[in-house]
Amino acid sequence: MSSRPASQLFDAYFTSAPMRQVFSDQGRVQGMLDFEAGLARAEAAAGVIPRALVADIEAACRAELYDFDALAIAIGSAGNSAIPLVKALGKRIAASNAEAERYVHMGATSQDAMDSGLVLQLRAAIDLLERDLATLSRQLAAQAQRHAATPMAGRTWLQHATPVTLGMKIAGWLGAIDRHRPVSYTHLRAHETRHDI
């Protein structure tokens, strides 16, 4: 099972292959599984579950191990995505370590798994956005220098105005990106690190 683009014709305008992967069905499931692995690590560190069982739980927290067609059917019946995924995770772990299966999802709700999984997807998306904006900034800076003396019509209220250079126009775009990029990224990361899994 895979996520189809929202629009086969226009999706390429608004996203990228790495971003599609982050928000694919596999990315969604992996986010919830990463939550489950993180939960097991945190509970072991707090002495709630035996530390020796964490490796068995982590080993089963890989999205490629699961049957997405079966999950899709089960999700339709369950009404949310976490219930059938946690059942499948428990079943997979029980096959190799019945004791570890008892501690899967311990103390968590379905909403915890879904919300935390989404936050982990958003974390990956933020990293992609920052990477792409850094690349865009470098490319705009290079083009602003390259076209520092390239004349173009200035515009005001949809009319031609005093001539400007293309380099100056591009530098304006660059300035807007560079003013907002560090603030946005730092703000998002500051909120995220307080709740690191």
What are these regions (language model features)?
Residues 1-189:
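A helix-coil-helix interface module used to build multimeric assemblies
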